[in-house]
Amino acid sequence: MKLISWNVNGLRACNGKGFQDFFRDVDADFFCIQETKMQGGQLDLEFEGYESYWDYAEKKGYSGTAIYAKHHPISVSYGLGVDEHDHEGRAVTLEMEDFYLVCVYVPNSQDGLRRLDYRMRWEDDFRAYVTRLATKKGVIICGDMNVAHNEIDLKNPATNHMSAGFSDEERAKMTELLGAGFVDSWRFQHPDEVKYSWWSYRMKARERNVGWRIDYFLVSENLKDRIESTDIHNDIFGSDHCPVELCIR
C-alpha cells in the first residue's frame, strides 16, 4: 500500500504546476495534502476512484489539510477535538480497518519564535491525541511537522539553532512524540542519508539544495515491521516542499 504526503503551499497554485500529473503518475492508495489554502467550493478537484476529505481553516487562504483515499474509511474526524486548535484546518484522520491515518499540518512557530508557546500546547495536545488512537490500533501520521529533528535534517544547523523549526523546544517535542511509541519511517530506513523536503524560496535555496527535512511519515511501533519502502521525491516541483512517500505491507 502506497501513501503520499505533500505540502502543496496552495492547491490552486500547485494545480497549475503539475499536481495532477504527479497525482496520477504516483497512483497512491492515500494522497495526503497540507496547506491547501482554500475554502470549500473554490476548486473542484476530484479523481476517479478516490474519495476526498477536507479540513478547511476558518481564515481564508490559510492552512488546510485533505486526504484523497482509494479505500473507504470506517470513520473520518477533523481536528484534534481541542477547540483552541480546531479552527485552522490542521488535521484529518481516517480510521481504516487496521490503522488510523492522520494527515497533519503542524503550526509554524513563526519568525522570532513568536508563536512558540502556542506550538508547545499544540504539540502536547497532538501527542495526546495520537497516543490515544494508538491504544486502539496502529497509527500512521504524515504531513508537514515543521521541525527538522536532528542536525542531519537541515543544511545549516549551526546558523538555524534558534530559528522556527529547529529550536531546542521544537526538537524536544519531536523527541517526546517518537518516545511515545512512534518511528520516523524515513530515518529508520535511511539512518545516514541526507535528503530534504523543503527549501526556502529565497537565495536559490532549492537550486543549491539548502534545505530542511520537515515532512514526515511516522508510524506506531506496531507498524514498524510493515514498512516496505520510503522516499522523498525531491525531483518533483510545484511547491516549496516536495512529496514524501511510505509503502507498507
Annotated model-derived regions:
Residues 7, 23-41, 101, 130-151, ...:
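Active-site beta-strand/loop signature of hydrolases that rely on acidic residues for catalysis
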Residues 37, 42-109:
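Structured beta-strand-rich core segments of catalytic domains in phosphoester-bond hydrolases
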Residues 70, 94-97, 220-221, 239, ...:
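Active-site beta-strand termini and strand-to-loop segments that position acidic
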